[in-house]
Amino acid sequence: VKIEIITNLNDNLKETGFGPFQACENVKQSLLRIDHSAIVTVCNNLSDLDGVVKRKPDIVVLAVKYVVIESGEFIWLSDFFDKHNISFTGSTRETLQYDSNKILGKERVSAKNIPTGKYFTTIPNQYKHAEELPLAFPLFLKPSDSANGNGIDTMSLVHEFSEYKTKVSTLYEEYMQPILVEEYLEGLEFTVSIIESGGRLIAIPIEIIPPKEDGIRILGSKVKTENSEILSRIFDSKTLRMILEIAEKSFKALGIRDFGRIDIKMDKQGNCKFMEANLVPGLKKGSSYFPRACKIAADIKYDELICLMIQGAIDRSQ
């Protein structure tokens, strides 16, 4: 099969997709090993994308969701290739919005009666006193559409109004968008890699254990960059069942196609809640959660994983 992996090297993208260029190279090498023809194409403008259409690949593997062209316009790759009748990996534009906008994702999942952590959104000076806040402290603050733990650090967990105001201002200054404020869930943290294969879901859950800093565990950009978190299989059968049920229901509720990663957190009573969906998960060999989870919890090797991830697009191209 003739395949092009489409990426973008724009550092301004808040959402990193498969990850650095090396991740796309990892995917390419994997495709070559399983006897496909594969190249990585960096698309920075419309003429780059038109070039892909002219080459007529059988499928395109979308390593990012969109390309920002010179005019500042967003070209959503799923829409672009759909319009040109080229089969692409992953979800449609309609579904990808639930990843790009974490609030939309939470609303959709919650509307389907899937357990979801309580939250609200805010901008600076929207609330003048602690009593006005929709939720009680402690609270957890983060950007509403950023990936890879960006904007998340030890200051994200706030216990009083002065800390809350400071973090809201800091995040708003950097991201210029409403801030997502969540009830703080102090229990364990999980992520579930899900692959659609032959009409069934292969769901692979793992626990993520960030290192303790100032007595708390926070999975922020520093931890993710340093790879200092531990990934572990889940051995408690009750927890495992709960996580799998939430992850699979969320996958279906959001209309995810081919693959996706569902993040789940536990509260102190042991109840699990949907946190967010990642529909273009990192694929850097050796460090990204998606391939690591597959290896740790299901012994699915990298090449086998890539093969499973692209099969839906191959089927649709025929």
Labelled PLM ranges:
Residues K2-T7, E25, L46, V53-K54, ...:
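Active-site nucleotide/adenylate-binding loops and adjacent lid/helix of ATP-dependent enzymes
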Residues V1-F88, E94, D99, I123-A130, ...:
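ATP-binding N-terminal substructure of ATP-dependent carboxylate-amine bond-forming enzymes
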Residues R257, M266-Q318:
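C-terminal active-site "lid" helix and adjoining low-complexity regulatory extension at the edge
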Residues F161-E245, M266-K273:
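Phosphate-binding site of ATP-dependent enzymes
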Residues E248-K252:
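Short, basic/aromatic recognition patches
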Residues L9-L13, S146-N148, S228:
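A short, flexible beta-alpha/helix-coil linker loop
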Residues L180-E182, R257-R261:
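Flexible, glycine/charged-enriched surface loops at secondary-structure junctions
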